[in-house]
From Swiss-Prot:
GO terms for molecular function: ATP binding. The keyword Nucleotide-binding applies. Homohexamer. The oligomerization is ATP-dependent. This is Chaperone protein ClpB. GO terms for cellular component: cytoplasm. The lineage of its organism: Bacteria, Pseudomonadati, Pseudomonadota, Gammaproteobacteria, Moraxellales. PROSITE patterns: CLP_R (PS51903). The gene is clpB. InterPro entries: Clp_R_dom (IPR004176). It comes from Acinetobacter calcoaceticus. Residues 6-20 are annotated as: Repeat 1.
């Protein structure tokens, strides 16, 4: 798993959390 993919996944999780 590349670091970029990890950050991308983390960013998406943060966006989802802000949506709540």
């Amino acid at each position: 798993m590349x670091f970029e993919x990890f950050t991308n996944r983390l960013q998406q999780a943060l966006s989802d959390a802000q949506s709540l």
